[in-house]
Amino acid sequence: MSEPAPAKRLYIKTYGCQMNVYDSERMADVLAPLGYGVTDDPAAADLVVLNTCHIREKATEKVYSELGQIKRLKEARRAEGQGMTIAVAGCVAQAEGEEIMRRQPAVDLVVGPQAYHQLPELIARAHRARGERLAADFAPDEKFDALATERRPTGVTAFLTVQEGCDKFCTFCVVPYTRGGEWSRPAEAIEAEARALAAKGVREVTLLGQNVNAYDGANGQGAGLAGLVRRLAKIPGLDRIRYTTSHPRDMDDDLIAAHAEVPELMPYLHLPVQAGSDRILRAMNRAHTAESYLRVIEKVRVARPDIAISGDFIVGFPGEREADFEATLQLVREVGYASCFSFKYSRRPGTPAAALPGQVAEEVKEERLQRLQALLEQQQLAFNAAQAGRVLPVLFEKTGRHPGQLIGRSPYLQAVHAHAPDRLIGQIVPVKVESGGRNSLAGVLELETA
């Protein structure tokens, strides 16, 4: 017997980082008791939520462009005698709440990343056409206390937020102003959520935080992220653990040791450095040097020789000279990355870097980004190609585009394509890699090659 259709339809569009993906999932959880079922069609939605990112100017402007399109859908539904509520959530909502309401009056409510547990009440206020329609409080403990441990089924992998906010105050970054200071969830609450996920068939969790390795939500010895990883590794059925995003200053010896000692912790580390020039790192207020970053990488590789390293880079930071950029390229060559994210510096209002002299011309930023990305893509292709001939344990997640094909993830987070029966979804299966491209691996089940 099929389940009844949901009484109301919810469309969520997510911009930005994995934490926003997690937040969007939890918003759907919060709204499910009100009768909202998720739809992929915004034109059919009774409630549209745009979960926004404020890291770069382009991402912010995308939100306003999207709101113009959603407004037209709202007007079309009104003409048909149907309603639509528009909500803007996330970091743009936190930073520009009043501006959003001014620029786009069709928006019914604005909710910051620490207040989305208030969505049911905000929606009720919007429907009553009275009361405050903007919630942007910094109270992450209240948010998580209000969220149920149980979550909707997510598949065989899931994100799990363990830490929010940032105290580092990099001069280019808006996170301390949109997400607040560093705050860690209690380990008991995280474990309860992880156990509930495992009971629903989740085999892999990625622990999320703006500075996830600053986690300190447990009491006593082993209170940091390493202790949390060891605790979660004991959960039956939870076979893989990852974490992101980390700061070099918080990569302590205990966490590095966990990479050697905890088999469930995958051999993959995303450790942003942003630049290879100490002069630029000082201007960014990163509080580490290129050399200290390289020392951390060396220690991690001693602990786990096969670990895949990922990172973030910003080119064209104010005052960046050619020599500074060359230092970044040299650091990339020394590390040898498996994958990376790289961006042109984006001037964000209210951040110290926005007022710095020496703003770099757009064409210079673009030229440097192309040079950096060419080197990073070369390294990524080399890392993937080096997997050919190896047998890797692959967690199959979903069907592929071709008949009989499944897509999974290697321990190094690469997408792996192989022909396999659907019954293997959710299973960790040995796959012999036949080839590695820039973005994925292709292989065959090891049983077929035996």
From Swiss-Prot:
Entry EC number(s): 2.8.4.3
Q: Which domain of life is it from?
A: Bacteria
Q: Which Gene3D superfamilies match?
A: Methylthiotransferase, N-terminal domain (3.40.50.12160), tm_1862 like domain (3.80.30.20)
Main localization, broad class: cytoplasm
Q: Specify the MTTase N-terminal domain's residue ranges.
A: 8-128
User: Cellular location of this protein?
Assistant: Cytoplasm
Concerning PANTHER family, the annotation shows:
CDK5 REGULATORY SUBUNIT-ASSOCIATED PROTEIN 1, MITOCHONDRIAL TRNA METHYLTHIOTRANSFERASE CDK5RAP1
Q: Which family does it belong to?
A: Belongs to the methylthiotransferase family. MiaB subfamily.
**Quaternary structure annotation from Swiss-Prot or TrEMBL:** Monomer.
Please report the name of this protein according to its UniProt entry.
tRNA-2-methylthio-N(6)-dimethylallyladenosine synthase
